[in-house]
Design a protein with these regions (language model features):
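N-terminal capping segments
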Residues: 3-57, 95
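Intrinsically disordered, low-complexity N-terminal regions enriched in serine/proline/glycine
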Residues: 10, 24, 40, 53, ...
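...with weaker cross-activation on analogous glycine-rich loops/strands in unrelated enzymes
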Residues: 54-119
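Cysteine-nucleophile amide-bond enzymes
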Residues: 1-17, 47-53, 68, 75-85, ...
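Aromatic- and glycine-rich peptidoglycan recognition patches
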Residues: 11-13, 17, 27-30, 75, ...
Length: 136
């Protein structure tokens, strides 16, 4: 079934989600360091995981997009699962926020992150973030 949301988001409501494929894609296509395109790289990983996503947007906008795609918010202290996606709010010089996907070992955005928090702006300012998961 094709759905067009109020925001104009077009996607298939009943599609097979493979978090493993999404995480694999993200890991294989990650750059050596950030190129400032985390939202694009994670969007491509979501598509590789089986969800046709036809709109982009900045990282922070995914806090609205992911629930439309049947992702639900999970607790920050819950155990990570492959395919979990973290979305950070914009803060300081990071006006678009940040987004990454968990591959089972590390967070991956446009690069393989060493930690969940990738910049001191997020660490020092108590930045808000949310983690999303889609059940199969």
């Amino acid at each position: 079934m094709v759905i067009i949301s109020a925001s104009g988001l077009l996607y298939l409501r009943h599609c097979e989600w493979s978090p493993e494929e999404a995480a694999r894609y993200a890991t294989e296509h990650a750059e050596k360091k950030s190129v400032g395109m985390c939202a694009l790289y994670v969007r491509k990983a979501i598509i590789a995981g089986g969800i046709p996503l036809y709109v982009g947007g900045d990282a922070w906008s995914y806090k609205y997009t992911l629930p439309i795609l049947n992702f639900h918010q999970v607790g920050k202290k819950s155990e990570r699962e492959v395919g979990d996606i973290v979305v950070f709010q914009p803060i300081g010089g990071r006006k678009y926020g940040h987004i990454a996907i968990w591959n089972g070992k590390q967070w991956v955005s446009d690069f393989k992150q060493r930690n969940l928090i990738v910049h001191s702006d997020y660490l020092n300012n108590g930045c808000e973030y949310a983690i999303y998961r889609r059940d199969r």
